[in-house]
């Protein structure tokens, strides 16, 4: 609801505080409108200092004679309330400070919930975190059907729980099972999903949102129907016992005990159901205070701030060029993924060139299948699917490329082929067109070597699967112009990606820190450690999958192709054990051909196989490598060997200027390879251990396993000077 839409209704202005976040007006029909508009900000966020302002507005409402009810709307174009201002937590020195913060919000929202007249939240745009908790305190909730409208409680993603009554009001409104699902995942709901769950009372076109809110006020405070019997059953002692046991086990299986917030959410919801709302709110505030002081929450909040700051940067000193049309070379898996995110997220027309029609058809089918899945999930309308599909077209020649502003190349990793692509684009596209290569290993300066306009050649390294992986590495070579850098970053943002600008050197950043990690896992394997023990060690450490499993997923042929390049250009520390060649020679490529270090069941799992793994360790690999699998090392030792090499290489990358800052290195590792977010990234993790401790561990490992563990000079110097990467 915009201010313009608010003003469209006949309004009698009451006391109006223009400098305030909240303004109060009364309509001729005696319905009060409270508009939320944080001055000078793009979106509304809640801060502790706003409480007094809101109470003043509430006081005005109470003094307004004949008032029939209140409607809360936003003065921002596409945001209701994006949540509480997370930076407030940084000002809390103790758990008591953070608890007080939660209690302030609870008391304010309790006043809304207990207001004797109907209060309606008219929601358009993001309604998240504290914004949804505010809406939950209202008697009615109506929202727009607009795609920008999203509702959720994402606090768990910051290592927190909803601290202003959300853990207590949501289960009572929609049932404990659905409420736990929303809070434990941090998922965001669209309007129709929210309506189906009972989170909102109506989802309507934006044009009539205020009208429907007015209707709700006129109906008075609603008498809520009891929840369905299935949900009521779960609130009883027996239902609670089984539900919370199941949820706790599933949650622990996912978090492996690394994240305290999900467990506290479960505890607090359970306490509120067993002991009542008041006790539940007290438990919520205490838990919020304690979680705010945890290392895990600090790490997750730091990542949030890092990612947010990157979104506001162009990566360059210049402004980007406008992007109206995008070209893609190659209709394979990567080309198809890049085309998909460009059209569906960037809403940009995409022209794909492939050597045959089959490649183009594969891209169209790939995007159709992904969009159809969203249609089936009710997250997209069939008409929207059709509109997005119309943005993608294909050709086997260069027709349509004359109007492209940027062309992303996703062909085979062959230098001469990529150089040929540069020449053909320079011939068939306009002079201003940027050429971006999705290479994972070839230096960009070599790809640009024969270009007529090398300043318009850059690397854009996407990660597979493109529709899921959030990171893009932007790789300028020495001659790349600032405008080209800014434009490449701009495209990545339009595609919904987080972009980091990295140096043009073998492996760039992500692959360079990943290869030693995987190679060390291979060293453990050829020494006799079982595959599942190695992978389990790193999953227990906090990675989403183990290194051997990851190699299978990426493709053993693809994953090992970059290793010789790194060995040649950066040294023997990147070398994998020679015996690993036997795996490749045996035709094992990983999941894509059903044979790797694991064996994969063909086809999708049947319904009776739900929960069963679709893969198992292929024991014939041990025969191939001439080893007898037997565990001699603790899981923690295996994890330490693999992770320490990654940390050491990350510091080298910073020292050499491959990454611009520790922040970029942390984002790259977490978003690119799944470095455990609760550590905050490699550099935050080093700071938590201390440089001296990391050097000590590396030297011990060097004495046991060789020169690949020699600590880099930068790390040694920082240890000697007792320095850290962050203030």
UniProtKB/Swiss-Prot annotation:
Main location: cytoplasm
GO cellular component, one term: cytoplasm
3-hydroxyacyl-CoA dehydrogenase: region residues: 321-727
EC number: 4.2.1.17, 5.1.2.3, 1.1.1.35
Record-level Gene Ontology MF annotations: 3-hydroxybutyryl-CoA epimerase activity; enoyl-CoA hydratase activity; long-chain-3-hydroxyacyl-CoA dehydrogenase activity; NAD+ binding
CDD domains per UniProt: crotonase-like (cd06558)
Signal peptide boundaries: none
NCBIfam families recorded: FadJ, PRK11154.1
Protein name per its UniProtKB record: Fatty acid oxidation complex subunit alpha
Top-level taxonomy: Bacteria, Pseudomonadati, Pseudomonadota, Gammaproteobacteria, Enterobacterales
Recorded name of the encoding gene: fadJ
């Amino acid at each position: 609801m915009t201010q313009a839409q608010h003003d469209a209704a006949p309004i009698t202005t009451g006391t109006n505080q223009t400098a305030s976040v909240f303004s109060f007006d009364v309509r001729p029909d005696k319905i009060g409108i409270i508009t939320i508009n944080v001055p000078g900000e793009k979106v509304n966020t809640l801060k502790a200092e706003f409480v007094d302002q809101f109470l003043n507005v509430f006081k005005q409402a109470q003094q307004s004679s004949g008032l029939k009810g209140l409607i809360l709307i936003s003065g921002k174009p596409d945001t209701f309330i994006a949540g509480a201002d997370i930076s407030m937590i940084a000002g809390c020195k103790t758990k008591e400070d953070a608890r007080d913060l939660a209690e302030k919000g609870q008391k304010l929202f309790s006043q809304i919930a207990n207001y004797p007249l109907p209060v309606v939240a008219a929601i358009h745009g993001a309604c998240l975190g504290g914004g949804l908790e505010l809406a939950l305190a209202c008697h009615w909730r109506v929202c727009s059907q607009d795609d920008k409208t999203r509702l959720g409680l994402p606090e768990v993603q910051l290592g927190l729980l909803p601290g202003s009554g959300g853990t207590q009001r949501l289960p009572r409104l929609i049932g404990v099972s659905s409420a736990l699902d929303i809070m434990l995942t941090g998922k965001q709901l669209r309007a129709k999903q929210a309506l189906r769950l009972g989170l909102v009372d109506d989802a309507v076109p934006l044009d009539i949102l205020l009208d429907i809110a007015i209707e709700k006020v006129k109906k008075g405070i609603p008498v809520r129907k009891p929840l369905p019997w299935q949900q009521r059953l779960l609130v009883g002692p027996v239902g609670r016992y089984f539900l919370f046991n199941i949820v706790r086990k599933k949650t622990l299986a996912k978090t492996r005990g690394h994240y305290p917030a999900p467990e506290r959410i479960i505890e607090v919801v359970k306490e509120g159901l067993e002991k009542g709302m008041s006790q539940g709110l007290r438990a919520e505030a205490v838990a919020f205070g304690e979680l705010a002081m945890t290392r895990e929450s600090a790490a997750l909040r730091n990542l949030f701030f890092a990612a947010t700051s990157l979104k506001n940067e162009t990566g360059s000193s210049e402004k980007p060029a406008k992007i109206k049309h995008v070209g893609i070379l190659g209709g394979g898996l990567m080309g198809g993924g890049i085309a998909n995110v460009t059209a569906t997220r960037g809403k940009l027309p995409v022209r794909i060139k492939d050597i045959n029609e089959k490649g183009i058809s594969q891209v169209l089918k790939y995007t159709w299948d992904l969009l159809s899945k969203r249609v089936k999930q009710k997250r997209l309308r069939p008409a929207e699917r059709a509109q997005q599909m119309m943005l993608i077209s294909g050709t086997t020649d260069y027709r349509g490329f004359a109007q492209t502003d940027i062309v992303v190349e996703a062909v085979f990793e062959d230098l001469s082929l990529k150089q040929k692509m540069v020449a053909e684009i320079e011939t068939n596209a306009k002079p201003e067109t940027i050429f971006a290569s999705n290479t994972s290993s070839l230096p960009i300066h070599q790809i640009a070597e024969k270009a007529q306009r090398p300043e318009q050649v850059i690397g854009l390294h996407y990660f597979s699967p493109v529709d899921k992986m959030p990171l893009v590495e932007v790789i300028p070579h020495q001659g790349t112009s600032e405008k080209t850098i800014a434009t490449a970053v701009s495209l990545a943002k339009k595609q919904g990606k987080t972009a980091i600008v990295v140096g043009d050197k073998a492996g760039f950043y992500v692959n360079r820190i990943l290869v030693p990690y995987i190679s060390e896992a291979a060293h453990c394997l050829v020494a006799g450690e079982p595959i599942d023990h190695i992978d389990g060690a790193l999953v227990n450490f906090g990675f989403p999958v183990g290194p051997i499993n990851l190699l299978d997923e990426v493709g053993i042929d693809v994953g090992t192709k970059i290793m010789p390049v790194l060995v040649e250009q950066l040294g023997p520390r990147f070398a994998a054990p020679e015996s690993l060649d036997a795996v490749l020679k045996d035709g094992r490529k990983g999941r894509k051909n059903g044979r790797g270090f694991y064996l994969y069941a063909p086809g999708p799992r049947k319904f009776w196989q739900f929960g069963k793994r679709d893969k198992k360790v292929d024991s014939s690999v041990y025969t191939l490598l001439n080893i007898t699998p037997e565990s001699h090392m603790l899981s923690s030792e295996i994890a330490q060997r693999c992770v320490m090499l990654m940390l050491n290489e990350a510091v080298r990358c910073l020292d050499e200027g491959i990454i611009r800052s520790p922040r970029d290195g942390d984002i790259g590792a977490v978003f690119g390879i799944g470095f455990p977010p609760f550590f905050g990234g490699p550099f935050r993790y080093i700071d938590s251990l201390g440089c001296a401790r990391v050097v000590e561990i590396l030297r011990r490992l060097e004495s046991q396993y060789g020169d690949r563990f020699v600590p880099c000079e930068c790390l040694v110097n920082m240890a000697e000077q007792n320095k850290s990467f962050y203030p």
